[in-house]
Amino acid sequence: MSCDRGSFVASRASGLRRAIVTASGILALALSASLWPNSAAKAQETQIIYPGSMAVTGFPGTVTPDFDSSDSGKGGLPPGSDPVDETFIDTSQASLRIFNVSRLGGPASGQLVYTPPPFEVTAGQVGEVFGLTYDDGVRDGVPSGIPNLYAAATSLHGIEIVTPDADDDGRPERQRRGTAGAVFMDGQFGTENGGGPGTIWKIDGISGAVSKFADIDTNSGPGIGNLAFDPTHREFFASDLDTGLIHRIDVDGNLIDTFDHGVAGRPAHGLAPVADDGAVMDIQAAAFDSEDPDTWGYTQDARRVWAVAYHGGRLYYSVGEKAEIWSIGIASDGSFAGDPRWELTVKAGQDYAVTDIAFDNKGFMYLAQRGPAENRYDYGRFADSGKGEVIRYQHEDPDDPATESVWVEVPQEYAIGFPQGNRQSAGGVDLQYRYDAEGNLDTSVCTDTVVNTGDKLRDNPELAERLAAGGPLAVHGVQLTPSALVKPANVPPFGSWFVDFDGYFEDPDVQGHVGDVRVWRPCEGRAGYYEEIPGGYLPPFYPPDFLPPGNLPPCLDVADVQYFCTPRGLQADLYLHDHAGLGGDSIKAQSKTPGVAVTSPMSHAPGKPYTIDITGHNPGETVNVGLCFYRKSDQDKGGYYPCCKMTLPLRTPDVSCEGRDR
C-alpha cells in the first residue's frame, strides 16, 4: 500500500476556500496549499528512517464537494444542503508524517522550520492514528540499524460515522447520532485495508510499506492510548482505552497476555479494585452521540491507561484524567512481574490525561498532557487545548523518607507555545539528540532536546510583529527545545524551533489536530552488521558486531569494578586495562544475558572509569556484558573501525536499586 500522491493542491481547492465564507460559518479544514510540493510518499528501496527522524501523527484534513458543480452526482452540493453534512475525512492526506529535522536552518529564535518533504502515510492507508513507537531494527535475526515504525488507531481525532447514500449524490450520509446501518467513515480506522479501532500498523523503515501488525479485536471504538517497545525482551505494549488493559504483544504481532491495572494495580496503593464496566461503543445505538465522548465506550477513568513507556526494566504507565503515574516490573522472561507500584500523582494546573511518557539518560521522566477529548461536528476541535503542560520529574537525590513518592514533589515545566500561559501541549513528547549553535543535529549527545506536539504554537497577538519574522503564526505541530530550558527560562519560547504538521497555515482556530511524536534516537552507537570480515583487520581487532573466534588472546581486561545506585538503576564503573595497546577512549556495551538491559553513554571523560547502566537483573545475578572498546576518532571517520571485543561476567551486588516500596 503505497501513498502515491502529489502536493496538497487539489481540484477541490476553490470550493474548499469558499466554505469559509458560507452562511453556515463552518471552517474549511481541507488542505488547499502545501509547504512541501510534490511530497509523494511511495515504497522506497533504501530507507525512510534515520537517526533523528521525527514521526508525528495528526488529523489529515477534510474534503468537501465542488460547490461549483451543478451536477450533484458528480460531486456538487445539493440545493439547501449544509456543507458540513457533505464534508468528509480526506483519505488522500496524511495522518502520519516522518520528518527530517537534522538541519533546522540556524539558531533557535522561535521560528518555523522548513523541513524537506516528509514521508507520509495517508488516512486511506491507516485511518486516524495517535500512539507511536519504533522497534530495534532486527530483521530475520540480523540487526539492520533501521527500525520499523508502529502507529496505533485512535479516537482522539474524533469519531465520524456514516450511513449508505440516501440522496443519490454518490456519497454516504454523515450522522451525528447512532443509527441503524451506521459504519465508521472511510479514513477513520483504515477499514478499507482491514483495520479497526484496535489496529496497530507497521511502517517498514526501509521500504515504507504499510501493513497491519496486530489487532486488539475486542476494542469497540475508543482505540489505543499509546504504544511502547521493550528492546530487552523484543515485545510491545499497547494500552486499550476500551477495557483499560495493557496488552503485551510479541514481535510477530501476536497478543500474549494482559495486565489489568484497575483490578491488579490499584490495590497495591491501598485503592479499591475497579473492574471494567463492560461499556462499548455502539454506533448503531441511539445513545451514541459523535459529539459526546461519554457515549464512546471508554473504560472508567480510574482504570483508563493512556501512556506506556518501557524504562529500566519496568513499564511505566499513566492512569486517568487526574493523572497518576504507575509502573510494573517486566520479568526476565518478558512477562508482567506482578509488582505494580504507584510512582506519583501529577501536579499540574489542570487535571488532564497524560498521553505520553518519555525518559532521558539523566534520570528525568517527561510527561505530556492532552486536554479532554471533544469532537465538533465541523471537525474544528478534537481536544480542549490551551492548558496542557509538558513537565518533567526526577528522582529525589537523596531520597526523602518523609515523602510518599521517590520522585520530587514539584515537577519542572516547559514553556509550550507563545499563547498566554505557554501551555499548548497536544499530548506528545519525546527526546531528540542535541542541536549545535547553527541548528544542526549532533548525534554524539543523546537526549539534549525535548520535542513535543502542540496547538497554535506561534499565535500571540501581542508578539505578532516579532513572530512574523519567523514565519506563519498558525502553527500546529512540534516544538523543539533544549532540555535545560525549563521555566522560567524560555518564556516566551524564543529559544525553541517549530515544525508544522501539515504545512497549511490558514487554520488558526483548530484544536487537537496534532497527536503524538516519536524520535528514532539510537544512543549506543550504530556499528551495523557485517556478513564477512572486511579487509585490513588483524586479531584481536574485529568490526564491532562481528563475533571473533574464541581462541584469541585477550585484548582487554578489567582491573576493577565499582557499583553505585542511581536514579537510572545500577551503575557499574569499569577500570579497563588496554592489553593490545589500541588506545581506545570509548566503549559500547550490550547485555548477553536474556532479560537484562545494559546501556552505556556515548562519551567518556579522560582519566575517568567507563560507566554502564544495568537494569532488569535480579540482585546478585551474574550479568554477561559484551564490550566493544574503540577510538572515537576511528568511529568518526565512518565505515569500519577497529574494535577490541570481550564478554565480561559481572556479578551484581545483592541489593536492589529499583527504588523503595511505599
Predicted feature residues:
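Surface-exposed, short loops/turns at beta-strand junctions within beta-sandwich domains
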Residues: 613-623
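N-terminal secretory signal peptides that target proteins for export/translocation
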Residues: 1-18
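Bacterial N-terminal signal peptides
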Residues: 21-34
